[in-house]
UniProtKB/Swiss-Prot annotation:
Cofactor binding, note field: Binds 1 [4Fe-4S] cluster per subunit. The cluster is coordinated with 3 cysteines and an exchangeable S-adenosyl-L-methionine.
GO terms for cellular component: cytosol
Top-level EC class as recorded in UniProt: lyase
Name of the protein: Phosphomethylpyrimidine synthase
NCBIfam families according to UniProt: PRK09284.1 (NF006763), PRK13352.1 (NF009895), thiC (TIGR00190)
UniProt pathway annotation: Cofactor biosynthesis; thiamine diphosphate biosynthesis
Cofactor: [4Fe-4S] cluster
Enzyme Commission number: 4.1.99.17
HAMAP family noted in UniProt: ThiC (MF_00089)
Function as written in the Swiss-Prot or TrEMBL entry: Catalyzes the synthesis of the hydroxymethylpyrimidine phosphate (HMP-P) moiety of thiamine from aminoimidazole ribotide (AIR) in a radical S-adenosyl-L-methionine (SAM)-dependent reaction.
Source taxonomy: Bacteria, Pseudomonadati, Campylobacterota, Epsilonproteobacteria, Campylobacterales
Gene: thiC
Quaternary data: Homodimer.
Reaction catalysed by this enzyme: 5-amino-1-(5-phospho-beta-D-ribosyl)imidazole + S-adenosyl-L-methionine = 4-amino-2-methyl-5-(phosphooxymethyl)pyrimidine + CO + 5'-deoxyadenosine + formate + L-methionine + 3 H(+)
Length: 457
């Protein structure tokens, strides 16, 4: 759908949404986002110009439907997919893309580390109508034969350029983790839990050199300018357990990310900030407020956070609790967690469970934040429930398939789609029906009492 839009800007040296926003230009992508968010296109432009909103939309991903990530728009969710060296295939990853989009993912990250990474990424981008993000360090490691010590600047930049050409709309770059942060890491219970962060730590400590993603940040920005790739500044030092939450390492890196965000904005590159992780419920608001302070209100994109470390097998629930609070307090996008977190590679079924948990969290947060129209669907569901409109209830549910499946387990016959009860209470104990009968009887009695008395003749 974007082919013509992109072609009209083909002669421009810098083709980022931020570049146009600064020039006072409302792009077709901005108009599209404004329409689906039900806010003005000028507000979208202003929020992009201020760095508070991004539209990740690589110029080469033309079948992408633009979407906005920022405090002015509804809370978004990301679905992580990707192969490992032990599991999955191209077909399985494409199936995860389809499931992600069906159940409401706003963006998808391809975190593949096994198989033919270029083929997988190409297939994922072609199959997706939502922006695709990547963590380029995985491809870099693949290209240096899994020996991170062989990383060099040319390989690093060539991988970024290749992925930008393929149509990746945002990169997670581990650029805020510095050598000076290592003493803070040494105090932790769990050290570095970011895959990309741990790889960079290995390289930095072996060569006793600064993080190359930090050192060559300006070169990365040039690639982003050319293809309108947004940067998701990665939190290499996110806490991996409650004991490490809100520590020196986490916030030292966050301050660096804030400085790098300013450099990205100066170069007309869109940017968001990644956040934790594992955080006790009572610390989430402080984490959000400090991110706003250190990063000048750049969109905050968090993983969870998980509010307990003992929910193995149910981490999608443990993290959705934290995600809801985080979004309520100002986080712009939530990275989902599946039931397989900490246990294994998620399959399509796990992807569905993770997305639905996070759709609930994001929607609840939007209601709490008072977004215009956020509760309309809930009110429509209440009307459908009270009127026993079962098909409408299924339609309004975040997961219509699951709602219908559970209803039909006990009452599968089509006649029960018109029944004024379900299998929970049956026809005699339904509170809705009892309430309706009470008011019906009361209204009938009132009607009788107000009838004029017949004249005696």
């Amino acid at each position: 759908m974007r082919t013509q839009w992109v072609q009209q800007r083909a002669d421009d040296k810098i083709r980022t949404q931020l570049h146009y926003a600064k020039k006072g230009i409302i792009t077709k992508e901005m108009e599209y986002v404004a329409n689906i968010e039900n806010i003005s296109a000028e507000l979208i432009r202003q929020e992009i110009e201020r760095g508070r909103l991004i539209i990740p939309a690589n110029i080469n991903h033309t079948n992408l439907k633009p979407m906005g990530i920022g405090i002015a728009t509804r809370t978004k969710i990301n679905s992580n997919i990707g192969s490992s060296s032990l599991a999955s295939s191209i077909d399985e990853e494409v199936e995860k893309v389809k499931v992600s989009i069906k159940y409401g993912a706003d963006t998808i990250m391809d975190l593949s580390t096994g198989g033919d990474l270029d083929e997988i990424r190409t297939a994922v981008i072609q199959a997706s109508s939502v922006p695709i993000g990547t963590v380029p360090i995985y491809q870099i490691l693949y290209d240096v034969k899994n020996d991170i010590l062989q990383l060099d600047i040319d390989t690093m930049l060539s991988v970024l350029k290749k992925q930008a050409k393929q149509g990746v709309s945002y990169f997670t770059i581990h650029c805020g983790f510095l050598l000076s942060h290592m003493p803070f890491v040494a105090k932790r219970k769990m050290g570095i839990v970011s895959r990309g962060g741990s790889l960079m730590a290995s390289w930095m400590m072996h060569y006793h050199k600064e993080n190359p993603f930090y050192e060559y940040f300006d070169e990365i920005l040039k690639i982003c300018q050319e293809y309108d790739v947004s940067l998701s500044l990665g939190d290499s030092l996110r806490p991996g357990c409650l004991a490490d939450a809100s520590d020196e390492a986490q916030f030292a890196e966050l301050k660096v990310l804030g400085e790098l965000a300013k450099r990205a904005w100066k170069a007309d590159v869109q940017v968001m900030i990644e956040g934790p992780g594992h955080v006790p419920l009572n610390q989430i608001e402080r984490n959000v407020e400090l991110q706003k302070q250190y990063c000048n209100h750049a969109p905050f994109y968090v993983l969870g956070p998980l509010v307990t470390d003992i929910a193995a097998g149910y981490d999608h629930i443990a993290s959705a609790i934290g995600a809801c609070v985080a979004a309520w307090k100002g986080v712009a996008m939530l990275c989902y967690v599946t039931p397989k977190e900490h246990l294994g590679l998620p399959n399509a079924k796990d992807v569905r469970e993770g997305i639905l948990a996070y759709k609930i969290a994001a929607h609840a947060a939007d209601i709490a934040r008072g977004r215009i129209g956020a509760r309309d669907r809930d009110d429509a569901m209440s009307d459908a429930r009270y009127s026993f409109d079962w098909n409408r209830q299924f339609e309004l549910a975040l997961d219509p398939d699951r709602a219908r499946e559970y209803h039909d387990e006990a009452l599968p016959q089509e006649v029960f789609k018109d029944a004024e009860f379900c299998s929970m209470c049956g026809p005699k104990f339904c509170s809705y029906k009892i309430s309706q009968d009470i008011f019906k009887a009361h209204n009938a009695k009132e009607s009788e009492d107000t009838q004029p008395l017949a004249s005696n003749q």
